[in-house]
């Protein structure tokens, strides 16, 4: 079939809805039967067959059990010595020691799978190469660096880290930041920006799901692509498990939209499953960029309800700072392609007059730097009056928990808002295991009773804030590709603080008692206790 015939066939399957959006999938195509007979079903069957074959081999060679036991003792000893000499957080080291002691072979295999980047060395090498190329295209304006140092030496030190070991991210002035306290607000602002595109539109999202939100966006993207705008869409491979079929990239390409799937699902055990692209970036012509917690699915704009009301947050950047967001997208897009940094990063950006400083930044799980966590800890350590946080999850390592508690013990008003209606029961149980230690140090915790808080927001002393995709959990801090925006002195900071206070007004205050924390849910309490010692492995 020729390319022209394919495009005609795919376009004939596009359905236009009264809401002005378009759909590429038929209603019901994402149901159980479709899942069973899709790539998801194939992957599941092949994985079960692989593990079944391994189990059968163990039974057939049961007469070698004494030799196996001797070997496992040796493996356990070697692995424990190795773990004790690794540069890792003790809250991560101890669970690995326990798992290795209880199940040596499984522990070693699991460690190699999650920690040693087996199968990811080429990806790691490629990303480091791309990061090096990006640095030269994102020079630091020395005048801006000096201005930040004069304004706040502590913030300048953070900027130095993000520019150096943190990944080569410069600090910018002249960048207007608009804060959106909901997915609906972001969606309303996003559509006219897409309509204004004349050169390119880049989208990188963790989740895309057909419906009102994506349909409206897709209609504009298809129209812009037909007008000659360079439209590119990238989404994480886990969408193939839950929301989109395997051939969805072909469907988009038939509309003139270039598409890439990060780490597609394969029917073999692979470390690709461990590292996911959790970023949410949208860039229009290099002059406007969006990020935050909002994915492209209807629950994020409360068009459909899953866990009560959905509370999210996002920011829109206009001006020089968008250049880094463009670079972050191009890094991921260029993993298997020739990079195009110079083509897009050297274009002039319309001049914008704005107060304050911003640093858009990314976090790569393969470079050995926990950038997202380091930024959070830095804000906690420099806080003098308050640190207000909205987060969907709370699965902490020792360093971040210590930073939260120490800030509160210094007299800082540390206040966290978490969901009253969680999306994952095991994550909810694990979060609650942290409540009492934090509360005992003076940290305040509230739960948003209308529904689920998916926003990732931290505001410090009303002067600095971080809004992005980075959750307070192990997967975000250790295993995901993430991004966020640090900001200081920008005009939207009072709006961020006001949103925190508005959200707090709808919360239940958690008191420092077991009854207040667990609310009599004994099974949830038991699950939290059982899961906590392996939390870093989840």
Q: What is each model feature region?
A:
Residues 412, 420-473, 477-478:
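C-terminal structural cap/anchor segments
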Residues 373, 401, 431-435:
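A general structural signal for well-ordered alpha-helical packing
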């Amino acid at each position: 079939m020729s390319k022209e015939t394919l495009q005609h066939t795919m376009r004939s399957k596009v359905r236009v809805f009264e809401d002005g959006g378009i759909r590429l999938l038929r209603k019901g195509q994402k149901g159980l039967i479709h899942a069973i007979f899709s790539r998801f079903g194939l992957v599941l069957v092949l994985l079960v067959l692989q593990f079944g074959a391994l189990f059968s081999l163990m039974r057939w060679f049961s007469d070698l059990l004494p030799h196996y036991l001797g070997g496992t003792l040796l493996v356990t000893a070697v692995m424990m010595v190795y773990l004790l000499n690794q540069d890792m957080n003790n809250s991560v080291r101890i669970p690995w020691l326990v798992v290795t002691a209880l199940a040596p072979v499984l522990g070693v295999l699991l460690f190699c799978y999650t920690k040693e980047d087996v199968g990811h060395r080429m990806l790691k090498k490629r990303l480091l190469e791309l990061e090096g190329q990006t640095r030269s295209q994102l020079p630091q304006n020395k005048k801006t660096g000096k201005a930040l140092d004069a304004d706040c030496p502590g913030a300048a030190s953070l900027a130095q880290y993000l520019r150096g070991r943190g990944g080569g991210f410069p600090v910018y002035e002249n960048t207007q930041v608009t804060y959106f306290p909901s997915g609906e607000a972001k969606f309303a602002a996003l559509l006219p920006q897409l309509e204004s595109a004349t050169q390119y539109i880049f989208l990188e999202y963790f989740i895309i799901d057909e419906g009102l939100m994506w349909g409206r966006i897709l209609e504009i993207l298809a129209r812009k692509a037909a007008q000659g705008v360079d439209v590119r869409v990238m989404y994480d491979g886990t969408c193939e498990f839950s929301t989109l079929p395997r051939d969805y990239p072909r469907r988009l390409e038939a509309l003139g939209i270039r598409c890439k799937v990060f780490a597609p699902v394969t029917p073999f055990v692979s470390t690709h499953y461990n590292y996911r692209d959790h970023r949410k970036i949208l860039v229009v012509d290099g002059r406007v960029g969006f990020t935050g917690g909002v994915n492209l699915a209807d629950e994020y704009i409360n068009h459909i309800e899953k866990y009560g009301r959905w509370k999210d947050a996002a920011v829109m950047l206009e001006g020089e700072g968008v250049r880094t967001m463009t670079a972050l997208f191009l890094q991921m897009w260029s993993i298997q392609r020739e990079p195009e940094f110079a083509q897009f990063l050297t274009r002039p950006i319309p001049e914008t007059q704005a107060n304050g400083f911003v640093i858009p930044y990314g976090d790569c799980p393969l470079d050995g730097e926990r950038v997202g966590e380091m930024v959070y800890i830095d804000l906690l350590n420099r806080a003098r009056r308050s640190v207000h946080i909205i987060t969907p999850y709370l699965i902490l390592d020792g360093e971040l928990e210590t930073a939260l508690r120490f800030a509160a013990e210094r007299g800082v008003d540390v206040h966290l808002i978490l969901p009253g209606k969680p999306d994952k029961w095991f994550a909810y149980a694990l979060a609650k295991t942290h409540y009492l230690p934090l509360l005992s140090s003076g940290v305040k915790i509230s739960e948003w009773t209308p529904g689920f808080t998916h926003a990732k927001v931290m505001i410090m002393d009303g002067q600095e804030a971080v809004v992005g995709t980075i959750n307070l959990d192990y997967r975000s801090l250790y295993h995901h590709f993430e991004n966020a925006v640090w900001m200081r002195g920008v005009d939207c900071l009072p709006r961020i603080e006001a949103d925190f206070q508005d959200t707090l007004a709808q919360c239940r205050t958690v008191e420092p008692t077991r009854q207040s924390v667990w609310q009599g849910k004994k099974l949830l309490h038991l699950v939290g206790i059982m899961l906590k010692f392996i939390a870093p492995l989840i």
